[in-house]
Amino acid sequence: MASVSALTEELDSITSELHAVEIQIQELTERQQELIQKKKVLTKKIKQCLEDSDAGASNEYDSSPAAWNKEDFPWSGKVKDILQNVFKLEKFRPLQLETINVTMAGKEVFLVMPTGGGKSLCYQLPALCSDGFTLVICPLISLMEDQLMVLKQLGISATMLNASSSKEHVKWVHAEMVNKNSELKLIYVTPEKIAKSKMFMSRLEKAYEARRFTRIAVDEVHCCSQWGHDFRPDYKALGILKRQFPNASLIGLTATATNHVLTDAQKILCIEKCFTFTASFNRPNLYYEVRQKPSNTEDFIEDIVKLINGRYKGQSGIIYCFSQKDSEQVTVSLQNLGIHAGAYHANLEPEDKTTVHRKWSANEIQVVVATVAFGMGIDKPDVRFVIHHSMSKSMENYYQESGRAGRDDMKADCILYYGFGDIFRISSMVVMENVGQQKLYEMVSYCQNISKCRRVLMAQHFDEVWNSEACNKMCDNCCKDSAFERKNITEYCRDLIKILKQAEELNEKLTPLKLIDSWMGKGAAKLRVAGVVAPTLPREDLEKIIAHFLIQQYLKEDYSFTAYATISYLKIGPKANLLNNEAHAITMQVTKSTQNSFRAESSQTCHSEQGDKKMEEKNSGNFQKKAANMLQQSGSKNTGAKKRKIDDA
């Protein structure tokens, strides 16, 4: 008869296996829900196509873009005249004319269009073709300031109201809202103005009764939905506008929204029937690239300066940073090396923001080093590069920010520097957001991918089907001619879990930095585990492996909140129990190599001309001299600083 200990051991094994099966069932259930959702989307699209092709369909309610791509409406002559003589444009971009015709017909419409596609024109031009004024709701004051600057240059009467508006200005705007002879065409407000100002709502009612309030434009309409990447609670109050002013047509605009987000936004805005026009996410002139972020700040700045002085010599660009502090520090570093750069962030004085924007627009400043506060509504067509000093907090944000390059349809580069530490800096910021961590991990997955077309990865996120061949080698992954293989990294995961278990027993919390140090046999001796052999891989490879385990849920983040900061720690994740099954394997794609090593493919570009390299080499000497002088000057201040690798530039 079997002993109790043997039976107990078998029972424990079965229990562990059952737990693993439960996790697998959960994963399959999640996948099932994804497929069901995609099936619904495709079914809806097929139904829409069939309805659009129905010969008996009424043109008044025909939601196909083709039905509205005409110039025989009563307002068409005026629209064309204003396009050419006020906005100084010869023709419309895709879906602009269709959207303008729908809103001119007094109907509700949502427009999903890539950043740089010309969404703003779709409510600005109709405002000039209509009596009265259009109310524009924007999420950021900086966005309103950007738009007003452009409108002023075009000679269009527009203004904004916010918390810092003077009493005299508020009084003037309120008077203009009901003045039948007023030339004021666009009034910009934040959603807080609608939610919290009874005085303003009262004035809107009087303007509506006087038939002066004709249209509502909700910019960044994805902010309505809690499932959107930038949910704002005050956007939920905007439903009052259609309830109180049903005859004022509404137009909602966004660069990034899934079908789920748009449906949610439609309910929140109290819209019964709504046209939805969606342009393809693809910007064929943009080249996407992910680079490993150098761990040394000086090396990092050197890499950026070589790009600016080489490939982008004399060309305009944006560098996006994670924080205001990063923005200012990078700006100073670039200026010290001869780059004409200006910082831009939310805490700048309005006049300073305007100065930076104006100088950049006039090419007096080559590079704006900015936080996310810069960009919405930016309409500089000749931006040749957008560099991300740190990755964005979501795919939607990255798509929107990188999309500010190449609005003139000429080739432009979108280069993202991916660093392990940025994961946890951003995670600590988005932890309180509804789906903040999930969206961040999608961004990490994009950065970690070394083989799949960048456009395919984006298309999957935005519910589109994309053939990688259509990329035309306009991303780093499509340019690679390396072979790839799946590397078994299961034992690495087992070792990390041993380290984390020991830390738990000692009542210790491990930050990502401490976990790597312990794994490498460094740091506090008590955190090292007997039997865990330090891997021989470079630190950046170990970081990629840990990031892989994190997004695959073998590890998870835990947070500690202090009065001054949110600290991220790593703990054992929900899928770690799968490792109780000896047959369970975790693999990771790596570049195939003849050497017995784990190496992720380094970033490379293939669309740049040989002249780029020559230009970089030509400017490299000047850069090295400047860098050497800087080091010489700072040497006495920081004798322990690491010597910059100038010879490797």
Swiss-Prot record:
Its main location: nucleus. GO terms for biological process: DNA repair; DNA replication; double-strand break repair via homologous recombination; replication fork processing. A motif (DEVH box) lies at residues 219-222. It is found in: Nucleus. InterPro entries: DEAD/DEAH_box_helicase_dom, DNA_helicase_ATP-dep_RecQ, Helicase_ATP-bd, Helicase_C-like, P-loop_NTPase, RecQ_Zn-bd, WH-like_DNA-bd_sf. GO terms for molecular function: 3'-5' DNA helicase activity; ATP binding; ATP hydrolysis activity; DNA helicase activity; DNA/DNA annealing activity; double-stranded DNA helicase activity; four-way junction helicase activity; metal ion binding. Signal peptide: none annotated. Its cofactor is Mg(2+); Mn(2+); Zn(2+). DNA helicase that plays a role in DNA damage repair and genome stability. Exhibits a Mg(2+)- and ATP-dependent DNA-helicase activity that unwinds single- and double-stranded DNA in a 3'-5' direction. Full-length protein unwinds forked DNA substrates, resolves Holliday junctions, and has DNA strand annealing activity. Plays a role in restoring regressed replication forks. Required to restart stalled replication forks induced by abortive topoisomerase 1 and 2 lesions. Does not unwind G-quadruplex DNA. May play a role in the repair of DNA that is damaged by ultraviolet light or other mutagens. This is ATP-dependent DNA helicase Q1. The lineage of its organism: Eukaryota, Metazoa, Chordata, Craniata, Vertebrata.
